[in-house]
């Protein structure tokens, strides 16, 4: 869970380490973008700036193309813990915060999600994109970011096709 204000009980060094981790992840996110699950394109941010939320740590802006038209979108960005798993209640709280601030979408970035969190896709009108962070980001301090590679990849339902077979059997093809 990422917080922008240090709780009084949290040691300063621990708070600063978490803040540094989030800053490094946002820097990589700005350069690498987010690879979409079902689209050939990626979200490429035109800007990422800090946001004073309890769960949302930044506002990312990007252009979305639809019907030949470009439209700027505002994304609330939630960065999960460096070591640990994002829970469904964390995602729900982040999505609620994003909706309250009129964001178009919540982009959650984490190394791991609980099973129940993986099923959470929308809160009201705000879609929730869950991007799995590449384990290479654990070495982000040493990682030279060229913008290449898929450091943040949105995941969701697998793309499958059901193919009827003889003898009342079916084949499931995973694309």
Where do the PLM segments sit?
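S-adenosyl-L-methionine-dependent nucleic acid methyltransferase catalytic domains
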Residues: 1-175
């Amino acid at each position: 869970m990422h917080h922008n204000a240090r709780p009084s009980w949290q040691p300063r060094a621990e708070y600063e380490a978490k803040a540094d981790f989030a800053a490094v992840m946002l820097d990589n996110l700005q350069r690498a973008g987010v690879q979409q699950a079902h689209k050939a394109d990626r979200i490429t941010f035109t800007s990422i700036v800090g946001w004073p939320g309890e769960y949302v740590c930044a506002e990312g802006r990007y252009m979305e193309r639809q019907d030949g038209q470009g439209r700027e979108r505002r994304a609330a960005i939630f960065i999960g813990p460096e070591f640990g798993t994002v829970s469904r209640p964390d995602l729900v709280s982040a999505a609620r915060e994003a909706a309250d601030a009129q964001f178009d979408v919540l982009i959650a970035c984490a190394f791991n999600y609980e099973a129940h969190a993986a099923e959470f896709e929308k809160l009201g009108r705000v879609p929730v994109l869950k991007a799995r962070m590449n384990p290479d980001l654990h070495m982000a301090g040493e990682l030279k970011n060229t913008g290449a590679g898929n450091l943040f990849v949105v995941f969701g339902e697998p793309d499958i096709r059901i193919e009827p077979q003889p003898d009342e059997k079916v084949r499931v093809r995973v694309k």
